[in-house]
């Protein structure tokens, strides 16, 4: 953010809003915890979900690039430095190569049948430690304790949220609340268009207040039966839900990413208020909503890649395979 403001010439509210919005795309780009949670609830393949998130995630990134280009043109913002040479780009690629290799190992290993998603998590940890300690030499043995403590805190917090959401989902199912809500939704939505429109609205609102994993546990069991009954691809449905929740994280007035972004200190005497970032984030939300509509009503944008890579009969999104 400071670099965009001081060197790039962008306004502080715009820069802060851009960082908040772009960071929310992380739950759409594999490997995504939200996809793992969705797959565990619905029984879809984690590999299918990971592959399905690639194109929508890239589309969201392209949409934000367009917003930045329009902002730069509107305020006549010129490049703050010369274009990198071929050698500089190659050097940067070589420095980042080992980091780029991790998602390739995870996704390639899962989709190639070399290891399961759980094993992929273990492999990625070992690989990350190897790269950090041996290749980049930024991690030492002395850092291990702090790393493990931070990991335990993060994992513990996530699992506490997931446990609470799972308990809520269990209570709803036990007392018939989930079935009643599902029947109500089915009675209102008689076709895919209406159903998807209602679901989008629900998830956009839910994403403002609840983190993606909790929202999955609460709403997916209610919506999935209707989704299946209407014949909508459940892998595409999972991607659509995740994109919704990503947008919800930056939707005013309670988008959690907005509060994180405005807490970042840009420089002394320059702070961004919630009102300022709420105005600045509007075009970015509009761009992401445009992508959401494409993903929702043209599901092939998220399904063609997993279908193309899946072995015959192994794709888990089609209703015939559920």
Predicted regions and their residues:
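Alpha-helical transmembrane segments of multi-pass membrane transport proteins
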Residues: 1-322
């Amino acid at each position: 953010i400071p670099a965009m403001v001081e060197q790039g010439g962008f306004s502080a509210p715009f820069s802060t809003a851009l960082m908040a919005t772009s960071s929310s795309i992380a739950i759409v780009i594999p490997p995504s915890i939200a996809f793992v949670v969705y797959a565990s609830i619905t029984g879809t393949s984690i590999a299918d979900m990971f592959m399905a998130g690639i194109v929508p995630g890239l589309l969201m990134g392209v949409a934000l690039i367009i917003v930045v280009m329009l902002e730069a043109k509107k305020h006549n913002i010129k490049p703050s430095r010369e274009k990198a040479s071929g050698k500089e780009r190659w050097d940067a690629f070589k420095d980042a190569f080992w980091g780029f290799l991790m998602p390739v190992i995870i996704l390639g290993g899962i989709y190639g049948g070399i290891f399961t998603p759980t094993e992929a998590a273990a492999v990625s940890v070992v690989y990350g430690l190897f790269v950090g300690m041996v290749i980049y030499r930024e991690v030492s043995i002395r850092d291990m304790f702090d790393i493990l403590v931070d990991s335990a805190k993060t994992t513990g917090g996530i699992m506490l949220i997931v446990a609470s959401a799972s308990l809520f989902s269990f209570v709803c199912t036990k007392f018939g609340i989930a079935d009643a809500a599902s029947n109500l939704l089915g009675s209102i939505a008689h076709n895919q268009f209406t159903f998807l429109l209602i679901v989008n609205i629900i998830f956009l609102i839910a994403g403002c207040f609840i983190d993606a994993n909790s929202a999955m546990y609460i709403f997916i069991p209610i919506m999935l039966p209707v989704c299946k009954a209407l014949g909508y691809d459940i892998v595409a449905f999972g991607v659509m839900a995740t994109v919704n929740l990503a947008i919800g994280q930056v939707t005013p007035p309670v988008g959690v990413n907005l509060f994180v972004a405005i807490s970042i200190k840009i420089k002394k005497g320059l702070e961004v208020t919630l009102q300022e970032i709420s105005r600045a984030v509007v075009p970015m939300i509009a761009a992401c909503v445009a992508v959401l509509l494409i993903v929702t009503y043209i599901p092939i944008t998220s399904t063609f890649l997993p279908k193309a890579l899946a072995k015959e009969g192994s794709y888990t999104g089609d209703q015939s395979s559920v």
